[in-house]
Amino acid sequence: MKIILLNILFISAMFAQSGLTVVGGLNQSKQTIEEDADDLDINYMNGYNLYVERSFGVARFGVGLNQRGVKLNQEVSDMGVTVSVAGEQTLNYLTLHAVYPYAIQEKITVFGGIQLGNGINGEAKIKQSISGSGLFDGTSVDSEEWDAEDMELEYGLFLGGDYMINEKIGVRASYFKGLSDIFEGVTTKNNTISVSLLFNI
């Protein structure tokens, strides 16, 4: 993590001192699962975003960190036995984006473009509970970790808008619609809603 942060600081230093925007805030992420997902509850997972941006010509380019994920719940009952499974998946990405901004009012700007994500690492925690069986009743917790080699290059649409409180400080709401699968052989895509503060240097 320290190396990643140093890389971001280095890239930030490469940007001109004027015109740099620092953005940071909260993510609410979930996933689109194209496989059979009957009886599977797919819920939002909290995360964070932290990145820097700068304008080059008519476009804005940014680099930073995004944490995505999902919460999954499933319960199956048969012959008096109930099996409940609750899972949390967290995925960390180094992201790059390019957007085209359009000012619709003096303080309001909307934008659209693309975002790429290179996987850093991830983790899944799964809690399984069995009840009604008697002998096999109980709860177990398992976890699994992934590194960058396990994760596919992510890409998708990046849309949003900025509201400037003053010349330096503003609020951003954005949406990432993943168009690529998160792992090889898995038809699952990330979707993220973000609310962030931005600061113009």
Regions inferred by a protein language model and the residue ranges of each:
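Sec-dependent N-terminal signal peptides
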Residues: 3-13
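Residues that define the transmembrane beta-barrel architecture of outer-membrane proteins
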Residues: 18, 42-48, 55-57, 90-94, ...
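Start-of-domain marker
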Residues: 18-68
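Outer-membrane beta-barrel "beta-signal"
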Residues: 19, 162-169, 189-201
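Repeated loop/turn-to-beta-strand initiation elements of outer-membrane beta-barrel proteins
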Residues: 20, 57-61, 107-110, 167-173
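Transmembrane beta-strands of outer-membrane beta-barrel pores
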Residues: 26-30, 56-58, 65-69, 116-120, ...
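Flexible, solvent-exposed loop segments that connect beta-strands
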Residues: 31-42, 69-92, 120-151, 182-186
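Transmembrane beta-barrel domains of outer membrane proteins
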Residues: 51-55, 99-102, 160-164, 172, ...
